[in-house]
């Protein structure tokens, strides 16, 4: 965990998050993968019919290391449904337990505007593309413990079909829960590309949604690429894990650091750091948010030479 997460672990202070900021991000987000004949992508915008915009919806989470980003994302989606006049959650986090064993868990069962009962699976992921990568397997998690291809296969081949199996249908009947008639997936997040060409790198024909949200990544030995250039000032914010979803939306009164402080802070940290970059051309101007990226400890050999 990053420095702010480590400090939270040491203090043991509960983590307070305004989920409205995460929901605002979600409503602007895109699926990581394109829809297929077997996978119907859930569109958060279709469920959002709030007549007034709320600015605050604070949830409290346990301190690190008990805090979980996935739980925060589930609560964000639940907040979306609570704001909807057309979509209603019937049940969430349904553990399928038989006499013999636990078969799995359904994230959400909801009813949509057409009175359909839908099984919805959720996942938010942040993957970076390895050097010279061209396949889904080359998108890996910031700590190297996860891969996009494995997650995609797990969701398609196991999680989504689960609600169509006889044991699960029987379990839902026993619990007096409606049987889903269709399945949807909300797999969103950000894909990060090597900083040098992060905006222009295109990986086609592997099923990615071409409109997915993207960012950059680099390793400690490459941080000089972030130096301000003549006529352009840069400032940065290092995000705690609980601000990874909403990003800049959480930074109402941002406490920015300059390039030197960024280098000092991130190179002392062996864990991945998510960073927001801000720019301005003149000192009397306000800094404008430009993009976000991941800074990683240099691996041997480096991911990028």
Task: Give the positions of each predicted feature.
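Intrinsically disordered, low-complexity Ser/Thr/Pro/Gly-rich regulatory segments
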Residues: 1-305
